[in-house]
Design a protein with these regions (language model features):
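A contiguous, mid-protein "functional segment" used to position or interact
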Residues: 433-458
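Residues forming the ATP-binding cleft of Hanks-type serine/threonine protein kinase domains
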Residues: 420
Length: 477
C-alpha cells in the first residue's frame, strides 16, 4: 500500500485573513479551524495578488502569477486550458484526486485534472442566462443544484432567499440546515472518504462557497452574533466619502452600507457564515478520525481572497487593501511532514505557493511553469506585485512585509501605507515618504515593463491606458 500522505485542501471563498480566533479576531468564532491551525504552521503574511475568484483560483490551481495565467481581472466564460494544474500533477503522481464544491472554471464541467468533481459554484449569473446551452446551465451542470431539486422538488433554488451573490443583505437560510450548500460540501466529502480506494493516497479539495455572499447562514449561527456589540470597521484619513455617498444605496455596490445597523448586520452575517463553515469542517475532521487517517493526512486551509466588510467605506473584494488581499493560510498535520507544530511564520506568502507546497509534500515533481515557492522552506520574497482590473478602480500595488504602495492606473492616484506602524491602513503617508515611495514605484514600473496595456514607458507610470481583464496570451494556451 502507498504510504504517502493524504492531502486535503480546505478552501474558503472571500474569507479575510484576520477572521480566525487563533489570529486574535475579537468577534469571530472558529473553534475547529483554530484547533487545526494550532496543530500546524500558520502564515501571518499570506496574500491573494489578484483578489477576485477567477484570477485568484487560476493562480492557486496552476502555481503561476497573474501575469502568467493571464487573468488580471474577473472574467467568466474564458476557457481554462493550462498544461499543468495542481490536481493534474497529483493525478499523474498516483494520487486519487477529488474536488467537492467550488471550482469556478470554464466550461463548468472542466475537471482541471481531477479524477472527479462534485460541483457547486454558488450563484453565477453568467451560467443562468437564456442563451446558455442547457448542458452549461448551472441548474443542470451544478451537482448541488441538481441534488437540491431531487431533495426538495424541481422548484427549489437557493435564490429563494431573495439574496444576491454580491449583496450585503442578510437573511437566515430558509430550508433545513442539512440542505445548505456548506453542509452539502462536508457531507459529500465524508461520503468520498467512505467510498475511496484505500490502496492509494488521495487529494481532496473541499471548496466552500461561503463566506462569499449570499449571507444566508442558518439561524443558529446568526443568533451567535446578531445581538453582539461587534467591532466597527476601520476608517482612514484617505477614505473616498464622495464615492461612498454616490453609491451607498446600491445593495450590491463596492461601497459599504450607510446605516450603522446594516453594517452590524453585514458583519454578523459574515461571521455567522464563517462559523457555520467552521462547524462543517469539524464534521469533515471527525470523519478523518473515524477513518483513522489523521496521522497520515495533511490539511492546508486557505481562501481565494478577502472581503472589505465595511472597512474604509468599502464592501466586497478587488481592492488593494488588507481586508481584500490578505487571506488565512495554515498547514496542519504530522510534524514529520510540516515541521514544528504551533509555529507562526511571517514569510510573504501568496496563492501561487500552494501548488508547489502540496506537490513537494506528495513527492511529485514541480513543473517549470510554476512561479510559486514551497512553503515548507523559508520564502525569499522581498515584495509582491498585485493588481486587479475593475474599470475606474483598476489598480496595482507593491507589497512588502513592512509597507505598501498603491497606484490607480485610470486616475493616477497613489497611496502609501506603513504597515508596520499602521496595519489597518488608516493613514496615507505618501507625502511624508518620497524616497521610499520612489523605490516602490520603480519596482512597479519594472513589473509592468512588458505589459500589453502600456502602463509604463520604462521610466514612468502612464495614466489612462486601457486596462484588460484577460491578457492576450491566455487565449492561446
Amino acid at each position: 500500500m502507498d504510504k504517502r500522505p493524504n492531502i486535503i485542501l480546505l478552501m474558503a471563498d472571500q474569507m479575510r485573513g484576520d477572521c480566525l480566533g487563533i489570529a486574535g479576531h475579537p468577534d469571530v468564532k472558529t473553534p475547529f479551524l483554530d484547533a487545526l491551525a494550532g496543530e500546524g504552521v500558520r502564515y501571518e503574511n499570506a496574500y491573494s495578488a489578484c483578489p477576485t475568484c477567477v484570477p485568484a483560483r487560476a493562480t492557486l490551481y496552476t502555481g503561476m502569477s497573474q501575469e502568467h495565467t493571464g487573468r488580471v481581472g474577473y472574467e467568466d466564460l474564458v476557457p481554462w486550458d493550462y498544461p499543468h494544474t495542481l490536481a493534474g500533477e497529483l493525478s499523474k503522481a498516483g494520487y486519487y484526486t477529488q474536488c467537492v464544491g467550488k471550482m469556478h472554471v470554464h466550461p463548468l464541467r472542466n475537471n482541471l485534472g481531477f479524477h472527479d468533481v462534485r460541483l457547486h459554484d454558488g450563484y453565477l449569473h453568467a451560467y443562468r442566462r437564456p442563451a446558455t446551452p442547457s448542458y452549461e446551465d448551472q441548474r443542470v451542470a451544478d451537482d448541488y443544484y441538481w441534488w437540491l431539486k431531487q431533495q426538495l422538488g424541481v422548484d427549489a433554488d437557493p435564490v429563494d432567499t431573495g439574496l444576491d451573490c454580491n449583496s450585503w443583505v442578510v437573511r437566515p437560510w430558509i430550508y433545513e440546515e442539512k440542505y445548505h450548500p456548506t453542509n452539502w460540501v462536508a457531507s459529500e466529502c465524508r461520503d468520498f472518504l467512505r467510498r475511496r480506494d484505500r490502496s492509494k493516497p488521495f487529494f481532496l479539495m473541499a471548496s466552500f462557497v461561503r463566506p462569499h455572499p449570499p449571507l444566508d447562514a442558518p439561524e443558529y449561527y446568526l443568533n451567535l452574533y446578531k445581538d453582539e456589540s461587534l467591532a466597527e470597521p476601520w476608517r482612514g484619513d484617505w477614505n473616498d466619502c464622495v464615492r461612498w455617498e454616490r453609491d451607498v444605496h446600491s445593495y450590491h455596490a463596492q461601497t459599504a452600507p450607510s446605516d450603522e445597523s446594516y453594517i452590524q448586520q453585514l458583519r454578523a452575517g459574515y461571521y455567522a457564515a464563517i462559523t457555520h463553515m467552521d462547524h462543517q469542517i469539524g464534521r469533515l475532521v471527525s470523519a478523518l478520525v473515524e477513518e483513522q487517517i489523521m496521522d497520515n493526512t495533511i490539511i492546508l486551509f486557505v481562501s481565494d481572497h478577502g472581503e472589505m466588510l465595511g472597512d474604509h467605506l468599502m464592501f466586497q473584494k478587488a481592492k488593494p487593501f488588507q481586508g481584500s488581499i490578505r487571506v488565512p493560510l495554515f498547514i496542519s498535520g504530522p510534524e514529520r511532514y510540516i515541521g514544528k507544530r504551533g509555529t507562526v511564520r511571517t514569510d510573504l506568502a501568496e496563492l501561487r505557493d500552494v501548488m508547489p507546497t502540496l506537490l513537494e509534500l506528495a513527492g511529485a515533481p514541480i513543473p517549470e511553469t510554476v512561479d510559486g515557492t514551497s512553503l515548507l522552506h523559508p520564502v525569499d520574497r522581498e515584495y509582491l506585485h498585485g493588481e486587479h482590473t475593475l474599470g475606474e478602480d483598476s489598480m496595482h500595488f507593491i507589497l512588502t512585509k513592512e509597507d505598501k504602495y498603491i497606484w490607480y492606473s485610470q486616475t493616477g492616484r497613489e497611496l502609501y501605507f506603513n504597515l508596520r506602524d499602521d496595519p489597518h491602513e488608516t493613514k496615507n503617508v505618501l507625502e511624508e515618504n518620497p524616497e521610499r515611495v520612489a523605490e516602490l514605484r520603480t519596482l512597479l514600473i519594472d513589473a509592468l515593463k512588458n505589459r500589453e496595456e502600456g502602463y509604463t514607458d520604462g521610466h514612468t507610470l502612464l495614466v489612462g491606458k486601457t486596462p484588460v481583464t484577460v491578457l492576450q496570451h491566455t487565449e492561446v494556451l
